[in-house]
Curated annotation (Swiss-Prot):
Protein name, per record: DNA translocase FtsK
Source species taxonomy: Bacteria, Bacillati, Bacillota, Bacilli, Bacillales
Entry annotated with the keyword Amino-acid biosynthesis: no
Family recorded in the similarity comment: Belongs to the FtsK/SpoIIIE/SftA family.
Function according to Swiss-Prot or TrEMBL: Essential cell division protein that coordinates cell division and chromosome segregation. The N-terminus is involved in assembly of the cell-division machinery. The C-terminus functions as a DNA motor that moves dsDNA in an ATP-dependent manner towards the dif recombination site, which is located within the replication terminus region. Required for activation of the Xer recombinase, allowing activation of chromosome unlinking by recombination.
Name of the gene encoding the protein in the UniProt record: ftsK
Annotated keywords: ATP-binding, Cell cycle, Cell division, Cell membrane, Chromosome partition, DNA-binding, Membrane, Nucleotide-binding, Transmembrane, Transmembrane helix
Alphabetized GO MF terms: ATP binding; ATP hydrolysis activity; DNA binding
Species in which this protein is naturally found: Bacillus anthracis
Cytoplasmic-facing ranges: 178-793
Disulfide bonds: none
Residues where ATP binds: 478-483
Length: 793
């Protein structure tokens, strides 16, 4: 009886404790599973992640957090919470809106990429979920899950996509109202108060700004009136009131810092190079690898089968004893002494900024580059300052700096700055030796690398002639053209052996290039007769055509490929074939050639400029008369690389560079160099080369090897076909034809009142003496000379 009573007490106690333990156990279990799900621990964690992602998609963490909140409620309250109270309903509405927005965004992206295979949103979401089950959690984007898919499908079917967005926004607003337990007016009232207060603050700030601006404009007008009155009395008074302006010192880049040259280094170099038989341009021959047998056999067979190939004209082979000239032949540059140049640069920078301020231009000098002849000030304008306003102040800036002339580069390529180039008080000489001794010249394999000078930053400027591929040099008399041409020729002589580069020089002035007669690099003696010049150019055209025939027979495309082809053949065959050298044609005065035989010269130059690059033939044309009848449009179109020295007018500058700037150069080697592909020209101080240095280089080269001229390239004497004409009207007829620049028998009949027979004899005599061209049917005959030539003859 006692035992039965004890069992009943225990059962009763078990029945009274069970509900509380049940909720605590369920709460702790749900909490543990939620943590495992968040951390994705094991198979259980990953499975629950997939479960929640199926319903909530990428927002599955909301479902997990909801389970955590439910577990905490079980443990604390030990009972079921009210899941349908007003605040929770508001939370549900916001979550549904978020899931729907997420699903709309997902399907817009999938539709744009064409990744949607099924038009049903629910089916597509289910397919994506099954795909994720295969690949693993977080491998596929599920948007808002199945809840989001149901919401999106329903709203899209009823209201379209825009209506779905509107429904989502309404759900968010209703959710906020349910959570806050307020109506719309109470919720929006704080927002309205904030907007109203911000508007009042902005209104007050605008009134203050307007009053301040009015005061500044009034003060500015007073300052402008006082400044104008002071400027009328004395210029110094403009600067005095601005002495209190704090100007940050600009960064000065001096080109003389790149010069390690001094007398001790000169002596050290002389000790190291005791004899003039070594050169920094001599390249060591790389070891020749034995080509494969099959390739060699093909080359030999192809060369043996070339029965139609034209014969080689350049038969001279490499002279193993030839030594390139050393740099010691050229003079060492003098040390550049820097005294108070930095102080002058700082003062000029202050003057520039003061001048800008006096004209109402907000700009600041931030960096200065001192070059050999000019100093470049980099000016950074403030936002809203027009570049054209700075360019328009060029004369005022020159007046403030007391400069001869200034050049404005607006803007500097690659920088948001304007460059103002001011001439130096003293021009520092740049020698060819220091240019060739720079690091940029450390390319012994480049046989056509020529030295030009130094730019404004002090860097050596060298150019590859084979990349240009032709060069036009123009400028007024005494501006430095001849020195530039000599520097180019000496650069080639210092780098290339006679079998590598050949030269043809045309010098109608007879004094500039005659010093190079006897150089082994010459194809012919220097051509000084203008009538022979056109013949020489035609021979170069014939050589170009012959080379293209060689390229066609050998299956190559340019001179580099052909020479590599010949090297492989010579390694495999005993019958050696010479390589093709580069040919550089130098014309020192184009204007004189155009006067004598304009049509022939222009046609030859046009053909060479258009086609000669691949054949290894390059033109360097110089002229001191940059007019459109000398530098024609055809020549300019085919010679993109140009050098402009100082000219007298902007028209001449446009003829050379297709733009202004050369009229503001200083002369004495100051040039604008625009290589092929450049958007703007580069200002360069040309390298100086004395006549004594040229003679020493020529003597050394001639001492290494004597000249072997190519007979086929030497122009023949032009026979004088002029004959004396007995008719007393001949001279008057020639003068009339030259003045009218047209010739016909009928014109002579009308003007001189003669018969047809006599007028026809006069025309025939003019044709025989080279005054007019041949008969061209109904067209008038071409007049071959102009008024200037007729007077000179």
């Amino acid at each position: 009886m006692a035992k039965q009573k004890q069992r009943g007490t225990k059962a009763k106690a078990r029945r009274t404790i069970k509900p509380t333990l049940y909720y605590e156990i369920v709460g702790l279990t749900l909490f543990a599973l939620s943590i495992i799900t968040i951390l994705q621990l094991g198979v259980v964690g990953k499975s629950f992640v997939l479960f929640f992602r199926f319903f909530f998609g990428e927002w599955y963490i909301i479902g997990v957090l909801g389970v955590i909140a439910l577990s905490v409620s079980f443990v604390i309250k030990r009972g079921w919470p009210n899941l349908l109270n007003k605040r929770l309903i508001g939370f549900y509405l916001i979550v549904l809106a978020i899931l729907m927005f997420s699903h709309i965004t997902l399907f817009n992206l999938l539709t744009k990429d064409g990744a949607v295979q099924n038009t049903s949103v629910i089916v597509s979401t289910k397919d994506n979920f099954f795909l994720e089950m295969k690949k693993g959690p977080d491998s596929v984007h599920l948007g808002g899950g199945m809840f989001g898919a149901l919401m999106f499908a329903t709203c899209y079917f009823l209201f379209d996509e825009v209506g779905a967005y509107i429904i989502g926004i309404i759900l968010v607003i209703l959710g906020i109202l349910c959570i806050t337990n307020k109506h719309i007016g109470e919720v929006l009232a704080p927002v309205g108060r904030i907007l109203r207060s911000q508007f009042q603050v902005m209104q007050g700030d605008y009134k203050d700004w307007r009053a301040k601006r009015t005061a500044e404009q009034t003060e500015k007008k007073k300052t402008t009136r006082s400044t104008r009155s002071k400027r009328a009395t004395e210029q110094e008074e403009i600067i005095e009131p601005m002495e209190e302006i704090s100007i940050d010192p600009p960064i000065i880049s001096n080109f003389t810092e790149n010069y390690p040259v001094n007398e001790q280094e000169d002596k050290r170099i002389e000790v190291e190079q005791e004899e003039l038989i070594t050169s920094p341009f001599i390249e060591e021959a790389p070891p020749v690898e034995e080509p494969k047998k099959k390739r060699g056999e093909k080359i030999v067979e192809s060369l043996e089968g070339e029965t139609q190939a034209p014969p080689m004209q350049f038969s001279n082979v490499e002279n193993k004893d030839y030594k390139l000239p050393a740099l010691d032949i050229l003079k060492f540059p003098k040390n550049k002494q820097v005294t108070n140049e930095n102080a002058e640069i700082y003062e000029n920078a202050r003057k520039l900024e003061r001048t800008f301020q006096s004209f109402g231009v907000k700009a600041k000098v931030t960096k200065v580059h001192r070059g050999p002849a000019v100093t470049k000030y980099e000016v950074y304008p403030d936002m809203g300052v027009k570049v054209s306003k700075i360019v328009g102040l060029s004369d005022d800036l020159a007046l403030a700096l007391a400069a001869k002339d200034i050049r404005i580069e607006a803007p500097i390529p690659g920088k948001s700055a304007v460059g103002i180039e001011v001439p130096n008080s003293e021009v520092s000489m740049v020698t060819l030796r220091e240019v060739l001794d720079s690091k940029a010249n450390n390319h012994p394999e480049e046989k056509l690398l020529i030295g030009l000078g130094r730019d404004i930053t002090g860097e050596a400027v060298l150019a590859r002639l084979n990349k240009m591929p032709h060069l036009l040099v123009a400028g007024a008399t005494g501006s430095g053209k001849s020195v530039c041409i000599n520097g180019i020729i000496v650069s080639i002589l210092m780098r290339a052996k006679p079998h590598e580069v050949k030269l043809m020089m045309i010098d109608p002035k007879m004094v500039e290039l005659n010093v190079y007669n006897g150089v082994p690099h010459l194809l012919t003696p220097v051509v000084t007769d203008p009538k022979k010049a056109s013949q020489a150019l035609k021979k170069v055209v014939s050589e170009m055509e012959r080379r293209y025939e060689l390229f066609a027979h050998s299956g190559t495309r340019n001179i580099e490929g052909y020479n590599d082809y010949i090297k492989e053949h010579n390694n495999q065959s005993e019958a050696k074939q010479p390589e093709l050298p580069y040919i550089v044609v130098i014309v020192d005065e184009l204007a004189d050639l155009m006067m004598v035989a304009s049509s022939d010269v222009e046609d030859a130059i046009m053909r060479l400029a258009q086609m000669a690059r691949a054949a290894g033939i390059h033109l360097i044309i110089a002229t001191q008369r940059p007019s459109v009848d000398v530098i024609t449009g055809v020549i300019k179109a085919n010679i993109p690389s140009r050098i402009a020295f100082a000219v007298s007018s902007q028209t001449d500058s446009r003829t050379i560079l297709d733009g202004g700037g050369a009229e503001k150069l200083l002369g004495r080697g100051d040039m604008l160099f625009i290589p092929i592909g450049a958007s703007k020209p580069v200002r360069v101080q040309g390298a100086f080369l004395s006549d004594d240095e040229v003679e020493r280089v020529v003597e050394y080269v001639i001492g290494q090897q004597k000249a072997q001229y190519q007979e086929d390239m030497i122009p023949q004497d032009v026979p004088d076909t002029k004959q004396e004409v007995e008719d007393e009207l001949y001279d008057e007829a020639v003068q009339l034809v030259v003045e009218m620049q047209t010739a016909s028998v009928s014109m002579l009949q009308r003007r001189f009142r003669v018969g047809y027979t006599r007028a026809a004899r006069l025309i025939d005599a003019m044709e025989m003496n080279g005054v007019v061209g041949p008969y061209e049917g109904s067209k008038p005959r071409e007049v071959l000379i102009n008024d200037v030539q007729e007077k000179s003859s």
